[in-house]
C-alpha cells in the first residue's frame, strides 16, 4: 500500500510553503522562552549576583530535558506525537507565564526563595524541551528535508530575534527606572504570546496542510502508529487500510538504527559539547571588560545567534551542504580548535577577535546540525525515521548537558568564582 504514495507529486507539493512557514514558527516557539531567559541574563545577574544565573539555570534545565527525552524516546513507538507536542507547547506557555507571575510576586527582588522558584520553572522548561524536540524531530524525520530545515531555521530565528530585541530594549530602557526589569518582562510577555500561537498552529492548522497529511499517511502505510491522532485531527479516521500488510511494516530496532547512525549521533553530541562549553556562560563571565562595557556580552550573544541562523540556511546552497559522513566528522572535530582560541583571545585579544570567534562558533553549529538532521533519516521507513529522530535528539541534548557541565571548568583559578 505504501507504493501508492510515491506517485502523488501534485498533492505532495501542495501546501509546502505554508508548511515551511508553520514549521518555522513552531521552531521559533520551541526555543523563544528559553532564549529570552538567556538573552536577559544581564537582568538575572543583577537580581541574583551571587548565583551564576547563566551557568546554574542551564545546568538545572539540562538534567530534566535529558532524562525526559531518554524516557520518551524509549516509548516513542507507543506515544501519540500529537499529544506529546501539544503537551510540550502548553507546558512552555504556562511556564513562561509563571516567570512573569514570579517576578511580579517578588517585586523583582532576589534571594534564595525567588531563585529556587526560578529554578523550578526552568526545570519545567527542560521537560517541555524534551517533549517538543523529540516529538517534532521524530515527526519531521518522516518528511522532506526542507521542512526539517525550516523548523531548525525557526529555532535559530528565536535566538537572533531575541538578541536583536534585547539590544533595542536595553537602549530604550537603559536610563529609565527598573529598565532591565521592564525589558525582561516585555520579553517574557512576547514569549508567552508566541507559545500560545504555537499551540494553536499545531492543534488546528498543521494537521490539515496537504503536504503534512501526505507524509503522515505515508508513514501510517508503513506501520507508524504515532501519527494516528494527527491524521484523525485532519479528518482521516480509519487507518486500517493503510497498514494492513505486516510483512512490509517490519522495522529496524532502536539498537540497529543507532548502530547504523552512530557517527551522526556522536557528531551531534560533540557539536553541542563544544558549543555549550562556551555559550553562554563563558561569554557572560570570562570575556573580561572592553570598550563596549555592559553591552559586550549582549553583542557576543547576538553575534552567535545571528550566525547560528545563517548557518541553518547555508545547507540550502547545494555546494555548501555536506552529505559525506567523513567530512562531517572532520568538520565537527575541527571545531574543538575554537576552545583554546577562545581562551587565548579572552586573555590577550581584543573584542574584534572575540566577535569573529563567536561568529564562527554560531555558523558552524547551525550548519553542521542541519546537515546531520536532514541526511540521517533518508532511506528509512516512517516508524524508523521517527525512532531515529528521537535517538538523535537524545545525543543532541546529551551534548548540551555535557557542555553545560564542562562550562564550569572556565571558573577554575578565577577569583571569587564560588
From Swiss-Prot:
Entry keyword Phosphoprotein: no
Record field: transmembrane: 19-39, 56-76, 86-106, 112-132, 142-162, 186-206, 264-284, 291-311, 326-346, 353-373, 392-412
An example Gene Ontology molecular-function term: nucleoside transmembrane transporter activity
Cystine connections: none
Induction remark: By nitrogen deficiency and 5-fluorouracil plus methotrexate.
Entry superkingdom: Eukaryota
PANTHER family the record matches: EQUILIBRATIVE NUCLEOSIDE TRANSPORTER, EQUILIBRATIVE NUCLEOTIDE TRANSPORTER 3-RELATED
Protein name as annotated: Equilibrative nucleotide transporter 6
Amino acid at each position: 500500500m505504501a507504493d501508492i504514495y510515491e506517485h502523488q507529486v501534485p498533492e505532495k507539493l501542495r501546501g509546502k510553503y505554508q508548511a515551511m512557514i508553520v514549521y518555522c514558527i513552531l521552531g521559533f516557539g520551541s526555543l523563544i522562552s528559553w532564549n529570552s531567559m538567556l538573552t536577559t541574563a544581564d537582568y538575572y545577574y543583577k537580581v541574583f549576583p551571587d548565583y551564576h544565573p547563566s551557568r546554574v539555570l542551564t545546568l538545572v534545565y539540562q538534567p530534566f530535558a535529558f532524562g525526559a527525552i531518554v524516557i520518551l524516546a524509549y516509548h516513542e513507538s507507543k506515544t501519540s506525537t500529537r499529544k506529546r507536542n501539544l503537551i510540550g507547547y502548553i507546558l512552555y506557555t504556562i511556564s513562561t507565564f509563571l516567570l512573569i507571575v514570579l517576578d511580579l510576586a517578588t517585586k523583582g527582588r532576589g534571594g534564595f526563595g525567588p531563585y529556587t522558584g526560578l529554578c523550578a520553572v526552568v526545570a519545567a522548561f527542560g521537560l517541555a524541551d524534551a517533549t517538543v524536540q523529540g516529538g517534532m524531530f521524530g515527526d519531521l524525520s518522516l518528511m522532506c528535508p526542507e521542512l526539517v530545515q525550516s523548523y531548525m531555521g525557526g529555532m535559530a530565528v528565536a535566538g537572533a530575534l531575541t538578541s536583536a530585541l534585547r539590544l533595542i530594549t536595553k537602549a530604550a530602557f537603559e536610563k529609565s527606572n527598573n529598565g532591565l526589569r521592564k525589558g525582561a518582562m516585555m520579553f517574557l510577555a512576547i514569549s508567552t504570546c508566541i507559545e500560545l500561537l504555537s499551540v494553536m498552529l499545531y492543534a488546528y492548522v498543521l494537521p490539515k496542510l496537504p503536504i503534512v497529511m501526505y507524509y503522515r499517511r505515508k508513514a501510517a502505510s508503513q506501520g507508524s502508529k504515532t501519527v494516528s491522532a494527527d491524521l484523525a485531527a485532519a479528518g482521516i479516521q480509519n487507518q486500517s487500510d493503510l497498514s494492513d500488510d505486516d510483512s512490509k511494516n517490519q522495522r529496524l530496532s532502536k539498537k540497529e538504527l543507532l548502530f547504523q547512525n552512530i557517527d551522526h549521533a556522536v557528531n551531534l553530541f560533540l557539536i553541542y559539547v563544544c558549543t555549550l562549553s562556551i555559550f553562554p556562560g563563558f561569554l557572560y563571565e570570562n570575556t573580561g571588560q572592553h570598550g563596549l562595557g555592559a553591552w559586550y556580552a549582549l553583542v557576543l550573544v547576538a553575534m552567535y545567534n545571528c550566525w547560528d541562523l545563517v548557518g541553518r540556511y547555508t545547507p540550502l546552497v547545494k555546494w555548501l551542504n555536506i552529505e559525506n559522513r567523513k567530512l562531517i566528522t572532520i568538520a565537527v572535530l575541527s571545531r574543538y580548535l575554537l576552545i583554546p582560541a577562545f581562551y587565548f583571545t579572552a586573555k590577550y585579544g581584543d573584542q574584534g577577535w572575540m566577535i569573529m570567534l563567536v561568529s564562527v562558533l554560531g555558523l558552524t553549529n547551525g550548519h553542521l546540525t542541519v546537515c546531520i538532521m536532514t541526511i540521517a533519516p533518508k532511506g528509512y521507513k516512517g516508524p524508523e525515521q521517527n525512532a531515529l529522530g528521537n535517538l538523535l535528539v537524545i545525543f543532541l541534548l546529551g551534548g548540551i548537558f555535557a557542555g553545560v557541565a564542562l562550562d564550569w571548568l572556565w571558573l577554575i583559578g578565577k577569583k571569587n568564582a564560588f
